[in-house]
Structure formats: structure tokens, C-alpha cells
Amino acid sequence: MAAHTRRPRALKLAALALSLLAAACSLVKSVETPLDSQEQAARWVREGKHAEAAQAYAKLSVDAPAEHDNYALLSAEQWVAANNIVAAKQAFGTLSPEARSKLPVARALVAAEIAYAENNPAGAIHELDQIAVPTVPDQAQNYYWIRGRSAFLTGHAYEGTRALVERERFLSDAGALRANRDELLNRVRGAAEHGQSLKYPAKTETVVAGWLDLGTVALELARNPLHAQGTLAAWKRQYPQHPANDGVLAVAQTQVSIATEFPDQIALLLPLSGRGESIGVAVRDGFIAAYLQQGAAGRPRLKVYDVAAESLASAYNQALSEGAGFIVGPLTKEDVAALAPLSNGRTPVLALNFLGDNVSAPRNFYQFALLPEDEARAVARRVVADGRPNGVALVPTNEWGARVSAAFADELKHLGGSILDTQHYDPSQVDFSDAIKTMMQVKNVKGEPVTHRSDANFIFVAGSSSGASRLILPQLKFHYSGDVPVYSTSDSFEPDSAANSDIEGMTFPDMPWMVASDPVTVQIRDSVRQAWAARTTRRDRLYAFGFDAYRLVPALRSKPPGEESPIAGVTGKLHLDEHNRVRRDLDWAQIKNGQPAAL
């Protein structure tokens, strides 16, 4: 939760009495007075030392019992700002019963802050509903800040936008206004990204309507800037006086300009014949689909080289001699390893696989890959974040399974979790009963209730194909283990499958292309499927891979995306690590009624 710095409430009568007492005592010896402590606490608030301020206010609540509730609320508020919600609740819990009537506004605001920090936005709104809108500017802006963000989190974008727009009436500082508008832009874009309704009543004021209409535009600016210029221009014609034009959109337009500045010529090196043809063609098609999203005037020249028909070295040198300003490819791990020592360091390369872990990338040599190990690590982080650090794993007996299992186990151990048991299965078989019963320690004694181990709070099913997972999950339920949450990788999910009901309840990470329902991703996905109607949708992830590879070219030439400013790609949120590898943060979904529901 964002920290809010506010001037502590003045306790005029008590402060005056205490200051007089302190002055009298100073004739004998120097002592620290409550007023001194209050000033010190206020100084810590201004300096952003929220934990220190919280402790000081807590001490004041004891030292000045007549003002206990006021100081306890200030302490709780600062603990929230310090992101220590346990301490905040403890301080809040010391309030007297009279605080509800004596300090209704302050009490409700702090209670709402605590609820919001605990991911309970509905609870935050409930607390705010107990009071009238504050008239004190400081309290009013905090009221609308909490109410607006809570409304967005409960899926009410219209109400959230109204609240944050109303908040601006109580903001006089230019920096605070800009921060509020940045928040509005992020919130309406997030609402669009999560498929929330951005509709509004017919007589909605223009500023509110403009923000809501900007949601999808902002998402397109982030996820598909190649196609966004026309959409943005149309919005600006409709809302020429909108406050978003004054700052936040200028930054967005600068980012779009950077995201569409391509070299004059790009070379794409892929296997388009032989053993790797089907994968190479799918990546090429996705790359070209992104290329076609861009207006013809802004497109670079694109030359495609089949590295299966000629040597990699020959294709690379030919691309350079023919004027390539950026190389994308090759695709296989072997070819990427072979290209690295050939790279001249001047012409940037985006390899579509990773070098070995102990191999340093040459200068201007970037790497992008769709690795199951990355998903396995993401699952490990998720189970720990969900409060389920200990569990069991079921993995296939093949090289893919070994890689995924090792990555999952390493990340889980690093985070303090543990795998209680790992069982292996043959993906060519259909009956996995023995592995499941051993893994879950199923006990089925005649005349007694069937039981399974109680120490496992998750089951990780590594499915190298969606077919295996669709067989495993029903068998888990058959063997009385359906009450334990199941996590898997994206390989377990295929879109548009009637058999997805067999993996009901499964939680998994996947790229937005596969699970997002926002209008921008749907437009991209539909345009690719229409352009390559004869291709199978089983190659969707490879289309997305090619699409994002094209998106990465201008970013890597100018300002490579960091973890704090990732690219909103269709394969995930993309950022570059210290080894010049593009990393992906994935979306999360759970199968509900046979369909992926965003988490």
C-alpha cells in the first residue's frame, strides 16, 4: 500500500498544558515532554521513517492517556505506511469503545486503510460507508484515495474513476495531481486488461467518461503500440480538453515513439525447412503478424533466411552484407550457441533461445525463450505466496520432466518450501494410480474412512502435454485427493478444448495470449488467426513468441526494459535481466467451468 504523509492532528489544549508543565520542570532538570515526542514523530513522518513514527505515537498513546485514541490511530496509520499490518491492527485494537463516536472520521479512514492493505477492498468500502465524506481536505483526499482504488479492485471501474476524479478537488500540489492522474491511467488500463466493464451512464461528466474511454486506449498503447496511434488520435479528438492530455499521455506517446523506432532493415533467421520447419514457420508467422500491425510507412524492410537450407554462418554473414540493422534468431539452442562467437558486437542480435548457464553473452547479444523451467519457478513462487509451501510433485519420466522438476524444487527450496515426495509417471500410459497412491499415502482400509497424507498443501502436476494432465486430475479425485489444490504449467492447458472440464480447479501460469480476455489481446489473437487461418491453434504460443520478438526489437535498440518498466507483451510482462536474457512475468488462471478464469 502506498504511504501517505500527513501532518499529525493538533492537540492544542493538551499540548499547551504539557508544554507549561515541561517549562516548569526545566528549572530543575531537562526532560522529554509529550510535545517533544510529538514533534519528533512528525519529523519522522516527513522523512518517511514510518516505523519510527509509529513507535513514537504508540509511546505517546501511553504517556498521554487523555489523548490515547488519537495517538493510537496515528500509530496504526504509520504502521500501515510501514507495511506492518500486524502492528497496525494491534495499535488499532487498543482504541477505546468511545473512539467510534469521538473520532468517527479518523477511525474509519484508518480501518479502511488496514482493510485495503489486507487485500479486502470490499471491507475498506464498508468502513468508508459508515461516515459522510470528510470536509477537511487532508481527510477528504485520503477518503477518495482509498475509495477509488478499492472500487477498482472490486470490479467497479466507473465508481473508482469518479472517486479519484473527485479527489482532485482537494489536491493543490502539482506533483500530487500528477500522481493522481498516473494512478487513474494505471487503474483504467488495469481494468481493461482484466476484462472489467468500462461502461458509464449516458449523462456522465466528460472528465470521468474520458478516463474510462482511455482504459482500452492505454492498454493498446502498452500491449500493441504498433496499432495504437490511430486509436489514441481518435480519443484526443473526442476529448481535446481532458486533463490526461496535460501530462500522462505525453509520457505514453514518448514511450510509443520509442516502441516504434525500428532499424531500416531486420533479418529473421529461422529453420523453415527440415526437422524444425513447423516451429520455425509458426514463429515467423507471429513475427510477420506483428510487422503487419504497423502502418506501412513505419515498417522496416524485413528479410527472412532459412538456416536449415544454408549454414548458420552463411545466413548471418549474408544478412549483414545485405544491410541488416538487427538480427532476430536463430531458434534452436545449438544454433544460438553457434552464433554467439560469430556475433560482431555492433549489430544487435535477439536470439530466440538461451545460451548455456555458464556462457556469457557477447555485447549486444540478447536472448528470448519460452522455457518450461521459468514456468516451474513461477509455480514455486505462487504456492509459497498462496501460503502453501509444502507439497508433492508428479512429473513425467523424460528429459522435460527432469528439467521442470529440478527448476521447481530449486526455487521452492530457495523460498523456504519443501517437496515432501516426488513421483514419476510414464506419459505414454493412462493409469497413474500407483504413483498417486504412493505420493499421497492413500490408505483405504475396509470399514474405515479413506485417508491421505495431511502434510501436503499442494500437488504440482508437471504435464508435458495437456492429455496427461487431463487424465491425472480426475484420477487424483478418484483416489480421494481432490481436496488438495493442484498447480501445473501451461502445457496442461489448451484453449477451445471440450476436455478442459477434466482439469477443473487447476491453477497455472500462462501467457496473456492464451488466457487474457481484454479487447486488445483478443484483437491481436484474432488478427493472427485470420491471417494464418490454415494453421492450427496448437501453435498459438509460438505465434505469440514471434509477435513479441518483433516488439522487442525497438526496445532493445533504445532503452532495454527493466524490471520496473516491463513491456506488456502477449507472452507476458517482459524485462531484461543482468545476463541479457528477456524474462517473462506470466498471467495466472484457474480452470472454472472449463474455462480459464484470471486470478
Give the positions of each predicted feature:
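Solenoid-like repeat scaffolds
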Residues: 26-31, 58-67, 93-103, 129-138, ...
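An alpha-beta-alpha
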Residues: 365-424
